[in-house]
């Protein structure tokens, strides 16, 4: 590996919406610069989780260092910092942007600009990055690069006269992209003489070396055996090794300002090396940390229970291990009369929740029951205190609380013009407040709504996709709490409260949700030998009920004719047995019933 001066280092990332070809483009850049030999190449090289390749999305950040001989004959070092494209991981995106001086904006030439592209572009513009527009997938028959150019100019306001057209799949335009990175992205600022400041943009847990931290040196230099201080967690460590990612790690003696690398220092948990934290030297610390570090707060909560109670310790260990590499995951033990022991977990969003659930089932071989997701409510109590509630079953009683506030989001939907009617209908059904509507081009519209997060986390995304045949895309940001007329809806199965089915709903919707829920449960819960009443109640008032009729054994089958009193005796005996059974009997509720809350189109 050559050691290049600062003027020949370029740090850049790739911004794109899901499926616009970002990972494929990264593959081509690695191949074209000879960083990865053709025989080692596999698709989505930087997506190293099996789940990432399967879903075709980037979850964890990756980094790679490439060498490129430019047209002027000099060898340049290009550090690619890969970013996730999904809205749930927007904090990770903002940190990786901070570690760069430029960004490739990849837009699918057949699809045009989408919601997440925009959100990330605005983050990049805030960091003053040099943005190079790249129109990908021009080999597709439906590609229309000219229309997409106009869209980028109209929506984002970027000059697209120098936009590069390419096809990452076939390799067209890759050398132009490499040349543009060298020519148009500025080199890092020379700050080698200043005290060490390095930004952590990712970390993962290695069972042998502890946490491996990926960082970008902003000023000063860092060497093996240095004693470092992490400014947010205030922890001190001695460095065991420092190195660069090629992809694959290679040790070096030191890294200076402008370079990207990794370090290992026997750090025990990812929580100690938080993403966005600043690394400095313990004996010569920097005066202030790099800006932009925030604690990531979970937004969506749900209960995870093992189907087999014996797996509870395994689930606890699996969550502890996952948390080592995923600092955004929060969990605490919870118990439920219907489900036994489990955990209440907090996630950044629905995709994050699905990914954690899949990783638990795949990597740790667990069989899980997941309760419906809920958001964090703010309850104002009569004694002037406030309580944050993430589990509807723990909501304080109506006599103790004054009001309930729920989180609201600002929602942006990008859609072809022909679908805006059905989307406006969907947002109104979900208690949305219309803000404005803008025409981006003659046939593309952006809708702005403010609506409760609780209405978004269930099946809003699926509904939006199915109503627009997959053409619409959305992006949301939290905008704070607002009071609403909310009530707690309890579900009673055989006169026993089923905690996992408890939901918090708006009073106007309570009856419809309750009715839909008990009808759904009636379909899903298997019949028993006795009658099962299903009730939905607000406090002590039942507002909807259904009952599952009993399976009846024909006890008179053996009586041919004979005296009526004999038949009565048998029927009374059966009725007595059923009565006892009803008092003692326990109803097993299948997993589908707990997800009924989710699939109910509120």
UniProtKB/Swiss-Prot annotation:
Span of domain tr-type G: 7-189
Gene Ontology CC terms, in alphabetical order: organellar chromatophore; plastid
Subcellular location: Plastid, Organellar chromatophore
Entry annotated with the keyword Nucleotide-binding: yes
Positions bound to GTP: 16-23, 82-86, 136-139
Chief place where the protein resides: plastid
Gene Ontology MF term list: GTP binding; GTPase activity; ribosome binding
BP-aspect Gene Ontology terms: positive regulation of translation; translation
Sorted UniProt keywords: GTP-binding, Hydrolase, Nucleotide-binding, Organellar chromatophore, Plastid, Protein biosynthesis
Catalysed reaction equations from the record: GTP + H2O = GDP + phosphate + H(+)
One Pfam family matching this protein: GTP_EFTU_D2
InterPro entries documented for this protein: EF-4, EFG_III/V, EFG_V-like, EFTu-like_2, G_TR_CS, GUFP, LepA_C_sf, LepA_CTD
Enzyme Commission number: 3.6.5.-
Top EC class, one word: hydrolase
Family from the record: Belongs to the TRAFAC class translation factor GTPase superfamily. Classic translation factor GTPase family. LepA subfamily.
Record function comment: Promotes protein synthesis. May act as a fidelity factor of the translation reaction, by catalyzing a one-codon backward translocation of tRNAs on improperly translocated ribosomes.
Name of the molecule in the record: Translation factor GUF1 homolog, organellar chromatophore
Species: Paulinella chromatophora
Origin organism lineage: Eukaryota, Sar, Rhizaria, Cercozoa, Imbricatea
Gene name of the record: lepA
């Amino acid at each position: 590996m050559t050691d290049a001066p600062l003027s020949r280092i370029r740090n850049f990332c790739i911004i794109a919406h899901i499926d616009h070809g970002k990972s494929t483009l990264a593959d081509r850049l690695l191949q074209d610069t000879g960083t990865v030999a053709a025989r080692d190449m596999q698709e989505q090289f930087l997506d190293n989780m099996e789940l990432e390749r399967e879903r075709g999305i980037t979850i964890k950040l990756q980094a790679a260092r490439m060498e490129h001989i430019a047209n002027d004959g000099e060898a340049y070092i290009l550090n690619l910092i890969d970013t996730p494209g999904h809205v749930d991981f927007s904090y990770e995106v903002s940190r990786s942007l901070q570690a760069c001086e430029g960004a490739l904006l990849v837009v699918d030439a057949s699809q045009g600009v989408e919601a997440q592209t925009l959100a990330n572009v605005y983050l990049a513009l805030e960091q003053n990055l040099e943005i190079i527009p790249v129109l990908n997938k021009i080999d597709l028959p439906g590609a229309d690069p000219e229309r997409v150019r106009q869209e980028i100019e109209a929506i984002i306001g970027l000059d697209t006269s120098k936009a590069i057209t390419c096809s990452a799949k076939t390799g067209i335009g890759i050398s132009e992209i490499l040349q543009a990175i060298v020519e148009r992205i500025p080199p890092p600022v020379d700050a080698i003489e200043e005290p060490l400041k390095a930004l952590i943009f990712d970390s993962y847990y290695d069972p042998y070396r502890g946490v491996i931290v990926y960082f970008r040196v902003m000023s000063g230099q860092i060497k093996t055996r240095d004693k470092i201080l992490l400014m947010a967690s205030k922890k001190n460590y001695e460095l065991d090794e420092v190195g660069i990612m090629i992809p694959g790690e290679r040790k070096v003696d030191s890294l200076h300002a402008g370079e990207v690398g990794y370090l290992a220092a026997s750090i025990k948990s990812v929580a100690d090396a938080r993403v966005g934290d600043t690394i400095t030297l313990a004996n010569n610390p920097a005066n202030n940390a790099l800006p932009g570090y925030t604690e990531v707060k979970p937004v969506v909560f749900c209960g995870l229970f093992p189907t087999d109670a014996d797996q509870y310790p395994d689930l606890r260990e699996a969550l502890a291990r996952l948390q080592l590499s995923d600092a955004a995951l929060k969990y605490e033990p919870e118990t439920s009369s219907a489900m036994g022991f489990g955990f209440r977990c907090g996630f950044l969003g629905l995709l994050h929740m699905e990914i954690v659930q899949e990783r638990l089932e795949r990597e740790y071989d667990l069989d899980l029951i997941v309760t419906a997701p809920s958001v964090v409510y703010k309850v104002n109590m009569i004694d002037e205190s406030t309580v944050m509630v993430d589990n509807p079953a723990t909501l304080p009683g109506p006599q103790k609380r004054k009001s309930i506030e729920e989180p609201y989001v600002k929602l942006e939907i990008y859609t072809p013009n022909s679908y805006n009617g059905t989307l406006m209908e969907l947002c109104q059904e979900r208690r949305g407040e219309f803000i404005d509507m803008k025409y981006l081009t003659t046939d593309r519209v952006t809708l702005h709504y403010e609506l409760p997060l609780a209405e978004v986390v269930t099946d809003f995304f699926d509904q939006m996709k199915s109503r627009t045949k997959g053409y619409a895309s959305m992006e949301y940001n939290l905008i704070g709490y607002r009071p609403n007329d909310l009530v707690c809806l309890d579900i009673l199965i055989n006169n026993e409260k089923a905690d996992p089915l408890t939901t918090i709903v708006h009073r106007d919707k309570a009856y419809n949700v309750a009715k839909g829920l008990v009808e759904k449960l009636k379909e899903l819960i298997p019949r028993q030998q006795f009658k099962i009443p299903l009730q939905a109640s607000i406090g002590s008032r039942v507002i909807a009920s259904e009952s599952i009729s009993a399976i009846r054994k024909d006890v008179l089958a053996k009586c041919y004719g004979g005296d009526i009193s004999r038949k009565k005796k048998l029927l009374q005996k059966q009725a007595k047995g059923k009565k006892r059974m009803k008092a003692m009997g326990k109803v097993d509720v299948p997993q589908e019933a707990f997800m009924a809350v989710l699939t109910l189109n509120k």
